[in-house]
């Protein structure tokens, strides 16, 4: 067990000692596969209640956490109460990397999170870091439900995970103290980015000066002038009120912000066929629900920002095309790192739905 897993285990142990989490006996952590006899035995189970566990790093009021809770509710309802999914948000049982590894090991049944923290474990997930990929959210969602999704599932499976679905928080947008309405306006812009090589390369390709910084440090960075701008999905802009320190919200739509629902293969293998079917069905329905929730919240969040006095800028098609052309090299970098198959599939799927 490595250091990160140990850190998670300590937090998890504390919850157990408080009686929050019962022993994960049912998850059968030690079993990576089940033989035919095991399957027959499990299929014969009747009346046995099952408790599973879901976690996310995000705050309780985010779409990510709401996605998780909706999924848990649907699983319980569809199983007539026989399967209960206990949910933990706000990093209660670990940060993104910790809960991801715990899910691989079967200590957590389900994890809800963006793909960015998964890239260090599953490099192929970087295909979703391709910049300026989608003209609108409808195309993005069709692609995330299509052949690309089917191929990504295989890479997750290799890491003892089941990719159940991908919802989203919409696009990542930009807030700035500098007015931006053309490509040249990005030149020299000190913008906070995630610690993600492809995100950093994207902003450099536009001429900006990207500065990786912890999310918790962004507000003070804007306030003190350490950075001029930042980029996030609207939800992550609203909650900490970054807009209070910014004159403009620029709808750059530069990256989709995907939210995955993943399951531990070990836990899924320990379920009966009927129980797994319930999980798959609930995940599909909750994915659609989460996307609809994102859409419903976007207008409200835009209104909050606008009412604060921050000006909203919608970039014209010419500027968006210029940004896309300028950042083509990032696509090449991703292809060099993960191979051409997924990038080619992404291009083909985008062309199909455009």
Residue ranges and their predicted role:
Residues 1-51, 354:
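Short, low-complexity disordered leader/linker segments with a strong preference
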Residues 32-138, 148, 157-354:
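N-terminal secretory/targeting leader peptides
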């Amino acid at each position: 067990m490595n250091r990160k897993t140990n850190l998670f285990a300590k937090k998890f142990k504390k919850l157990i000692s408080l009686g929050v989490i019962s022993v994960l006996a049912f998850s059968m952590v030690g079993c990576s596969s089940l033989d035919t006899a095991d399957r027959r035995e499990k299929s014969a189970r009747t009346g046995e209640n099952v408790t599973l566990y879901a976690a996310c790093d995000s705050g309780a009021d985010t779409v990510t956490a709401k996605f998780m809770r909706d999924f848990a509710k649907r699983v319980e309802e569809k199983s007539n109460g026989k399967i209960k999914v206990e949910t933990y948000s706000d990093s209660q049982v670990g940060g993104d990397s910790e809960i991801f590894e715990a899910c691989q090991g079967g200590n957590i049944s389900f994890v809800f999170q963006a793909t960015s923290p998964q890239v260090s474990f599953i490099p192929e997930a970087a295909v979703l870091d391709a910049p300026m990929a989608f003209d609108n959210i409808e195309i993005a969602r069709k692609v995330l439900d299509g052949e690309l999704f089917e191929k990504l599932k295989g890479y997750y499976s290799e890491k003892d995970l089941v990719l159940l679905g991908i919802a989203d928080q919409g696009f990542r947008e930009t807030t700035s103290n500098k007015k931006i309405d053309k490509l040249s306006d990005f030149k020299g812009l000190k913008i906070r980015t995630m610690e993600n090589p492809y995100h950093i390369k994207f902003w450099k390709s536009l001429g900006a000066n990207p500065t990786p910084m912890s999310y918790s440090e962004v507000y003070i960075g804007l306030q003190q002038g350490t950075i001029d701008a930042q980029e996030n999905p609207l939800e992550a802009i609203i909650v900490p009120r970054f807009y209070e320190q910014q004159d403009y919200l620029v709808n750059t739509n530069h990256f989709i912000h995907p939210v995955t629902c993943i399951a531990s293969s070990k836990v899924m293998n320990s379920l009966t066929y009927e129980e797994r079917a319930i999980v798959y069905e609930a995940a599909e329905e909750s994915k659609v629900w989460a996307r609809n929730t994102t859409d419903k919240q976007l207008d409200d969040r835009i209104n909050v920002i606008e009412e604060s006095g921050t000006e909203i800028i919608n970039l014209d098609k010419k500027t968006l095309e210029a940004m896309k052309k300028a950042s083509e090299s990032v696509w090449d970098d991703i292809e060099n790192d993960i191979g051409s198959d997924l990038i080619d599939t992404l291009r083909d799927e985008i062309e199909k739905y455009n």
